[in-house]
């Protein structure tokens, strides 16, 4: 797709032009979009003329890397050079690749994809330094923070993080004319089913003429189209073994070719009932016939996982499938016919064909970016007055995807500790909660506050998203001294926590 390679970036300085673009940083493909002067969300083609840029990084020599390499170049590369699905590792502090003398984190590798998107778009739009970037609803705080860091490394000021289903719902509501129009306001319930290459989200959204409100959401950051491909890879590999062949997964080069062939077969089976997969391996030519019914049978458990999640979201919002006004498909993996069939059974209607599943998230990010621009003083963002008024009339309301809490201990048994949830999942944001706790010991030198994200009481099963200490306490504080903790979550997903002991009013925050 592109034969242009770029050096691994040093940390870039930030400019601050008025334009804000929307970016879908995807597991398999990424895209950048704007809202044009006619009010149309438009995805900007890359230098190869495609609206989609593969989220693949090919590591070269001399600290160079290529994003979205040509298929032939990728096929000739060594396995250790290929970086795919890096989005799944964002926020994982234990993951890093060694390339020469450099340690490549998921944030740095993701920044290369963002840099490619920015540089390609700048050839058409001029300087780009601000963006809204989308993430799966079920990304936790560490993953969201890592996404912002990736943008910063790429020289982008990430003015907001928006959840992918919300972005898609914005695109649907905007392009259908249901959002931002003057007239009678009718509330509609929209189910957004987002099955991408590496992540899955399902969200129930309520839309009126001026308001978009998320009612419930759930998902899985480790479930996506690549898992269907992997399952097909296992099936074909076992068939080759049954024919007396050597397991193709044992050779990294052959394993890569098999995976690519299975990806192609998966896509073909979305359009045809039968396909044949061919693979040369260990001096033999193998030919495996695959049918859509067999593919759907061996991946039925994966689809069922998405159905279970969808039913859970409907139950959380107290909505029956038959009460849905529309079902919107997002993500390239929704092209699999089994997805449409399952959702039609669940909702009693076929999913909408209004949106392009692979572009709608980037388009929604661009609409959200334009809404933010419209609220800035002295900035017109290239939009006319009527369009600006339409954008200014829109409000959105999200919910948090994970419960937020603090670690507490038993006063009589300090080894006993648990997660005390202060903001339950699916709470409308922004929100702020204040609760009181007490100290466990006499004359403490500091009060340690540990912030957790998770749905269970077991601390070890939760994610630690931060910690801080309240120090310089008054001397002689008795056990049982009250401590006030204030937990806040803003519209952009920023978490702020403050703690104050109520005798000397000493406080700290993070």
Per-segment meaning from a language model:
Residues 111-118, 303, 307:
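Short, hydrophobic/amphipathic alpha-helical packing segments
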Residues 1-89, 99, 103, 122-510:
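Oxyanion-binding/catalytic loops of NTP- or PPi-dependent enzymes
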């Amino acid at each position: 797709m592109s034969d242009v390679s770029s050096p691994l970036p040093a940390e870039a300085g930030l400019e601050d032009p008025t334009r804000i673009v929307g970016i879908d940083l995807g597991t398999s493909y990424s895209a950048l979009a704007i809202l044009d002067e006619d009010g149309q969300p438009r995805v900007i083609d890359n230098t190869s003329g495609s609206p989609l840029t593969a989220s693949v990084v090919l590591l070269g020599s001399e600290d160079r890397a290529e994003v979205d390499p040509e298929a032939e170049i990728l096929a000739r590369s060594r396995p250790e050079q290929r970086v795919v699905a890096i989005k799944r590792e964002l926020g994982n502090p234990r993951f890093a690749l060694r390339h020469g003398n450099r340690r490549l984190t998921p944030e740095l590798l993701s920044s290369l994809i963002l840099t490619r998107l920015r540089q390609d778009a700048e050839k058409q739009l001029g300087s780009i330094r601000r963006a809204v970037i989308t993430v799966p609803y079920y990304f936790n705080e560490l993953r969201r923070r890592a996404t912002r860091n990736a943008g910063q490394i790429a020289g982008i000021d990430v003015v907001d993080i928006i959840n992918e289903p919300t972005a898609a719902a914005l695109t649907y509501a905007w392009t259908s004319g249901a959002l931002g129009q003057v007239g009678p306001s009718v509330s509609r319930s929209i189910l957004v089913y987002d099955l991408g290459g590496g992540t899955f989200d399902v969200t129930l959204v309520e839309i009126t003429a001026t308001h978009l409100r998320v009612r419930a959401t759930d998902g899985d950051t480790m479930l996506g189209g690549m898992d269907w491909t992997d399952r097909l890879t296992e099936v074909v590999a076992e068939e080759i073994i049954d024919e007396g062949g050597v397991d193709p997964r044992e050779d990294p080069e052959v394993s890569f070719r098999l995976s690519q062939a299975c990806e192609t077969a998966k896509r073909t089976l979305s359009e045809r009932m039968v396909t044949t997969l061919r693979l040369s391996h260990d001096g033999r030519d193998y030919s495996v016939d695959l049918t859509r019914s067999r593919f759907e049978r061996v991946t039925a458990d994966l689809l069922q996982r998405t159905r279970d999640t969808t039913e859970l979201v409907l139950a959380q919002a107290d909505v029956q499938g038959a009460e849905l006004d529309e079902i919107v498909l997002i993500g390239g993996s929704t092209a699999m016919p089994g997805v449409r069939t399952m959702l039609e059974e669940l909702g009693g209607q076929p999913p909408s064909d209004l949106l392009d599943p692979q572009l709608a998230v980037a388009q929604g990010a661009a609409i959200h970016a334009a809404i933010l621009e419209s609220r800035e003083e002295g900035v017109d963002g290239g939009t006319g007055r009527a369009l600006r008024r339409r954008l200014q009339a829109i409000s959105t309301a999200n919910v948090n995807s994970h419960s937020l809490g603090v670690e507490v201990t038993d006063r009589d048994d300090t080894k006993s500790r648990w997660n005390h949830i202060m903001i339950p999942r699916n709470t409308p944001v922004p929100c702020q909660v204040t609760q009181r706790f007490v100290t466990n010991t006499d004359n403490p030198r500091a009060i340690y506050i540990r912030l957790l994200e998770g749905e269970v009481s077991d601390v070890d099963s939760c994610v630690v998203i931060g910690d801080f200490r309240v120090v310089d306490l008054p001397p002689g504080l008795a056990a049982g001294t009250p401590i006030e903790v204030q937990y806040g979550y803003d519209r952009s997903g920023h978490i702020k926590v403050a703690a104050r002991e109520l005798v000397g009013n000493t406080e700290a925050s993070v």
